Amino acid sequence: IRDTDRSRGLGDVYKRQGFYRARTHEVIDTRECLLVKPEADAAAEAVRQYMRDFRAAGYDERTGRGLLRHVYVRSNTRGECLICLLVNGKRLPHEAELVERLRRACPKAVGIVLGENTRRDNVILGERYRTLWGADRLEDVLCGRVFRLSVPSFYQVNREQAERLYAKAIEYAQLTGEETVLDLYCGAGTITLALAPHAKRVLGAEIVPEAIDDARENAARNGVGNAEFFC
């Protein structure tokens, strides 16, 4: 999300919301993207209108000023989604109004989370999270296992290709059931748990504490007893 010049006649600040132009930090205004689920486009449009109506400033990474940085939407096979708003601060103006708009735009949303990110860089995810409404995690099914996913936990964005990728990795590994397998940067444990039936022991390592919490719970929920996770 970026502010552009005051050039539309009424002193209004037009908000650009979309994706980066290749090899730049310039945001290209995007109303629809065929690569994302419809609920992501709907959430982005609701935030766009909220910013216009309440003059909420988009973040400018050149100056470190402005509030809204990113709209982060994670969806599952049931069409449900978890929405996270990444902000340069602790609060948004008129938070309750924004929550209602997002719930109307995305009726299958399970939760809306605010993430604080005051870093002066282009890292997307935040340092702290606060649930504005609903759940703080989303459930999804991958490789026949159910995973609970918090906002900071890494998860493959293309579920169908991830399943093919994991199957090919297992094939190439040629495990006999006697190995100890180390999964570095394991996120919520998706690859670790996919490998578990084929190895004696699987170990996942990750620097994000929330992801390790998710991975441990996912192992327990799926009845995987030979997996351990470390942060």
What does each model-identified segment do?
Residues 18-21, 86, 215:
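Short, acidic/hydrophobic/Gly-rich beta-strand patch recurrent on exposed beta strands
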Residues 64-78:
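Short edge beta-strands and adjacent turn/loop segments
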Residues 29, 73, 79-88, 146-150:
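Short, aliphatic-rich beta-strand segments
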